[in-house]
């Protein structure tokens, strides 16, 4: 058996005394405010950040953005808000000790959705013997931005 964490929230996202590299609570409160105001607009904007879409960069197709939007709107408004609290406030660090199998952590250094320091790097440091592969500049949705590289790394590790 082996485990792989890809752009995972494992670690702890919320900034507090025990997690100075975390994300300020105001960011998550802002997300919830935006969801309540206009969930559809939030989801469209969120997808662009998720995949690293900018003014001059578009690492995924409009189809991928549309697919992500459809997935998001299938969740209820309450579930969408609850999801923000779940990924922001759940501290997975105590679970690291339970990993007793070879573990690969893959995370993009350009991930603005789930920053690498309190998650990917924290997981790699907290899980005994874990291997960290950082994808330089890649966003959270690296499964869609660099699928060939991800698949190759998975095959090599899991073989």
What residue ranges belong to the model's regions?
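Conserved hydrophobic packing residues within short motifs/helices of P-loop NTPase cores
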Residues: 4, 104-106, 133
């Amino acid at each position: 058996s082996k485990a792989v964490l890809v752009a995972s929230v494992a670690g702890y996202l919320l900034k507090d005394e025990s997690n100075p590299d975390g994300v300020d609570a105001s960011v998550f409160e802002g997300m919830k405010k935006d969801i309540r105001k206009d969930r559809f607009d939030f989801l469209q904007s969120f997808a662009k950040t998720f995949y690293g879409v900018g003014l001059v960069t578009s690492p995924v197709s409009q189809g991928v953005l549309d697919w992500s939007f459809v997935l998001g709107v299938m969740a209820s408004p309450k579930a969408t808000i609850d999801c923000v609290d779940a990924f922001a406030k759940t501290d997975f660090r105590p679970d690291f000790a339970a990993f007793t199998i070879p573990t690969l952590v893959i995370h993009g250094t350009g991930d603005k959705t789930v920053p690498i320091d309190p998650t990917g790097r924290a997981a790699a440091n907290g899980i005994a013997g874990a291997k960290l592969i950082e994808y330089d500049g890649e966003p959270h949705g690296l499964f869609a931005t660099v699928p060939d590289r991800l698949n190759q790394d998975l095959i090599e590790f899991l073989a």
